């Protein structure tokens, strides 16, 4: 896979290396039954006229024979042959003219090595990527070829560590929105085929974000928007639909596909009763649209319970019977659903079997609108009043403490003054005694 930029070091002149590669291709073709192959002679004639670009065209086309090489041709020979071709092509000022064809050849199945063909192709494509200038748009086409091979060989783990560099590459290539979209969709397809639904959805959203407002209603944008919407609705761990509703292309479904948009709004902010009303109104539509009805029912129950927890008020608790009624389940199933909503990360709390109550520690708002702001304002007012009360108590205690300290200080001063007064009284008596003594003398 792509890594630091490097070079291929091969000794020999262009003419010598061309002759070597052409001879190797002729040998392969003759082993495949093409006895008339004379690439070596054709390229020699062109070299006499110094038509190097024409020589390279023939070599690139001839390289298709490597995909059908006999099984006895080992991986080392396969890689060495392609490295030689890449070295020759890189010497041309028109290198961009040849690399797309080479990538196309490598994207095709390598019939000579069905088990290792994907690995061989990825090795060569990685070499092309890493020997190409970091800012060259050729890298974009090479990466698309790499993605095609990874998808064909179900080798997503090879791609995963490279995804973190994708934005940096696109910036270096100064990629236009349409080309970025194509790349994001290719990554999404690879992830989807590999069962990586979260990654597939992430890159599908990134592709949708490349549509400008004026193209949000285009047929292609509509198709991708519906694909993203269906993926979000049926994904077992996706509960926040704000990422969808913020997109212009999704908002455009309000006109082109109003039923789909209505369903999205229900999952974004409504409850199970609303979803059941929707199903009654559009009987059979969910199944006809290719959606998993059971998955939608389960998700709607979890979202409904999350909404109930968020709006539980200051009591921060929900009785079992209230949960059972809202989720349209039996009382015996309540604890199972509460555990599921906790596992989904929508709510935190604990069950009180003794009181048949769910005690809520934390809840998640599905949408944050006027009602939620009012609730936040109410809670802030409550906290402010509570803190005001605490502050008043603290100030009263502080005042009492200061008063006590002042009283203690006053008492200490009084004691000190009394002691000083006593000492002064004793000192006045002593001189009189001395005077009496002096008078006797």
UniProtKB/Swiss-Prot annotation:
Subcellular location: Cytoplasm
MF terms (GO), sorted A to Z: translation initiation factor activity
GO cellular component, one term: eukaryotic translation initiation factor 3 complex, eIF3m
Keywords noted in UniProt: Cytoplasm, Initiation factor, Protein biosynthesis
Chain spans, region Disordered: 405-441
Domain PCI: 196-365
One example of a Gene Ontology biological process annotation: cytoplasmic translational initiation
Pfam families xrefs: eIF3m_C_helix, PCI
PROSITE patterns: PCI (PS50250)
UniProt signal peptide: none
Compositional bias of kind Basic and acidic residues: 405-418
Keyword Nucleotidyltransferase annotated: no
PANTHER family the record matches: COP9 SIGNALOSOME COMPLEX SUBUNIT 7/DENDRITIC CELL PROTEIN GA17 (PTHR15350), EUKARYOTIC TRANSLATION INITIATION FACTOR 3 SUBUNIT M (PTHR15350:SF2)
Family: Belongs to the eIF-3 subunit M family.
Assembly information from the UniProt record: Component of the eukaryotic translation initiation factor 3 (eIF-3) complex.
HAMAP family, per database record: eIF3m
Role played: Component of the eukaryotic translation initiation factor 3 (eIF-3) complex, which is involved in protein synthesis of a specialized repertoire of mRNAs and, together with other initiation factors, stimulates binding of mRNA and methionyl-tRNAi to the 40S ribosome. The eIF-3 complex specifically targets and initiates translation of a subset of mRNAs involved in cell proliferation.
Protein name: Eukaryotic translation initiation factor 3 subunit M
Organism classification: Eukaryota, Fungi, Dikarya, Ascomycota, Pezizomycotina
């Amino acid at each position: 896979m792509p890594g630091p930029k490097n070079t291929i070091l091969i000794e020999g002149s262009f003419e010598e290396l061309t002759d070597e590669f052409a001879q190797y291709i002729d040998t392969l073709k003759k082993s495949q039954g093409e006895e008339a192959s004379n690439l070596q002679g054709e390229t020699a004639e062109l070299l006499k006229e110094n038509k190097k670009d024409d020589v390279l065209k023939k070599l690139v086309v001839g390289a298709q024979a490597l995909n059908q090489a006999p099984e006895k041709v080992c991986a080392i020979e396969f890689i060495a042959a392609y490295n030689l071709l890449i070295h020759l092509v890189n010497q041309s000022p028109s290198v961009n003219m040849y690399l797309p064809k080479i990538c196309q050849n490598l994207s095709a199945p390598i019939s000579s090595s069905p088990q290792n063909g994907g690995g061989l192709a990825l090795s060569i494509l990685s070499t092309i990527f890493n020997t190409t200038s970091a800012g060259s748009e050729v890298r974009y086409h090479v990466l698309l070829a790499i993605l095609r091979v990874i998808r064909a060989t179900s080798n997503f783990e090879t791609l995963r560590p490279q995804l973190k560099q994708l934005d940096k590459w696109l910036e270096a290539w100064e990629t236009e929105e349409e080309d970025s979209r194509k790349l994001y969709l290719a990554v999404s397809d690879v992830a989807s085929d590999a069962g990586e639904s979260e990654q597939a959805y992430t890159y599908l959203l990134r592709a949708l974000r490349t549509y400008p407002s004026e193209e949000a209603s285009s047929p292609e944008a509509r198709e991708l928007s519906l694909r993203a919407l269906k993926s979000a609705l049926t994904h077992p761990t996706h509960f926040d639909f704000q990422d969808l509703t913020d997109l212009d292309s999704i908002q455009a479904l309000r006109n082109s596909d109003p039923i789909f948009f209505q369903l999205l709004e229900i999952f974004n902010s409504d409850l199970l009763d609303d979803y059941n009303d929707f199903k009654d109104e559009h009987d059979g539509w969910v199944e006809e649209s290719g959606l998993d009805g059971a998955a939608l029912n389960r998700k709607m129950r979890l979202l409904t319970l999350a909404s109930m927890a968020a709006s539980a008020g200051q009591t921060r608790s929900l009785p079992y019977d209230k949960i059972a009624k809202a989720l349209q389940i039996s009382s015996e199933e309540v604890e199972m659903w509460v555990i599921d909503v906790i596992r989904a990360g929508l709510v935190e709390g604990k069950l009180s079997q003794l009181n048949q109550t769910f005690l809520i520690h934390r809840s998640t708002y599905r949408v944050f609108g006027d009602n939620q702001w009012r609730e936040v304002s109410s809670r802030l007012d409550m906290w402010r009043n509570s803190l005001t009360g605490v502050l008043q108590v603290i100030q009263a205690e502080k005042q009492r403490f200061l008063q006590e300290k002042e009283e203690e200080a006053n008492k200490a001063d009084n004691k000190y003054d009394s002691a000083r007064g006593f000492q002064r009284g004793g000192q006045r008596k002593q001189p009189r005694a001395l005077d009496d003594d002096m008078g006797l003398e």
